Design a protein with these regions (language model features):
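N-terminal glutamine amidotransferase
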Residues: 1-123
Length: 123
């Protein structure tokens, strides 16, 4: 079963949310999953970067891959495949970048109105 975790640090605290996201994913492990991932946004002055780390298998592998990353906000996801292969391409989060803008999405299940959403977001 899929699970979603999100974290945002108060601006004045600038707390690293990566350990919070990983801990949240660990608490979801009992539900079962085949892949896990996280996307984080780091803010340095006016420069914002989004980084994505995805892994097939255990959250421990994701934790190892995310060592040293810091961020003030992020989302994380565990996936239990009902459609599509179990691989890093299908692991969440999904990121799309266009014209200097980024959007990061995690979801549970099938997005039935994906074409309508795509058209609205591209407008």
């Amino acid at each position: 079963m899929c699970g979603i975790v999100g974290a945002i640090s108060a601006v004045r605290l600038k707390r690293n949310v990566v350990p919070i996201l990983i801990e949240g994913l660990k608490k979801l492990e009992y539900r079962g999953y085949d892949s896990a991932g996280l996307a984080i946004q780091s803010t340095n002055g006016l420069i914002r970067t989004i980084k994505r780390v995805r892994a097939v298998g255990r959250v421990a592998a994701l934790e190892s891959q995310s060592e040293g990353l810091t961020a003030t906000s992020g989302i994380a996801h565990t996936r239990w495949a009902t459609h599509g292969a179990v691989n890093t391409d299908n692991a969440h989060p999904h990121i799309s970048e266009r014209d200097g803008l980024s959007i990061c999405v995690v979801h549970n299940g099938i997005i039935e109105n994906h074409e309508d959403l795509r058209i609205a977001l591209q407008a």
